[in-house]
Amino acid sequence: MGDWESIFKKSGKVFLKIQEDMKRVISLLKKDKAKKILDLGCGSGRHTVLFAKQGFDVTATDVSKSGLKMTRKWLKEENLSAKLKEHSCYEKFPFKDNTFDAVISTQVIHHNFHNKVKFCISEIERVLKPSGLAFITVSANKYKRRASKFEIPEPRTYVPLDGEEKGLPHFIYTKTLMRKDFKNFQILTLYKDKGDHWCLLGRLKEIAP
């Protein structure tokens, strides 16, 4: 396999469980009077639907046409709306600077080599408004791999050679690396969830002109 379109075509509506800290995130967003939310790598739509239900103006992107199709269908079933766009998070985001009050991305951006992941983080910073919030989760454990065979093309990166995510690079974060790569954020929370993912809730620092 090796690409998300193949995964969604084969497995259908997957990754449906709401991330455990989303209630806290939503509460903080409402306290901030946030309106415009980017769901980066929306998959089949679990968080897009959740945020739309809460009344936010949601834009959702994903690299998979099938994932977006499922998201669109789910929104329609719930009589909700969101802006959907096919896009890879490792390419320049198709949005102007300072567009969003918050960016949400769960178990998405670590699926590439480190330089690509860092580019994605820089784009998250660009499209966020000053003091905007980001809730990002990434892989934390390089030993619990979803493959019996893999290669390690560069440090802290493995590529499964079999299984559902065959051919997809996975960059594995440490707490130190999280703080380094998200240095432009005031980190409000940084913890490991039950699924061995680093979960970061941060506020973009305002940079003096």
Model-predicted regions and their roles:
Residues 1-34, 43-92, 116-119, 135-209:
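Class I (Rossmann-like) S-adenosyl-L-methionine-dependent methyltransferase catalytic domain
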Residues 105-108:
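A short beta-strand submotif of the Rossmann-like class I SAM-dependent methyltransferase core
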Residues 110-112:
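A short His-aromatic
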Residues 118-130:
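A short glycine-rich, Lys/Arg-flanked "PGG" loop and its adjoining helix->strand segment in the class I
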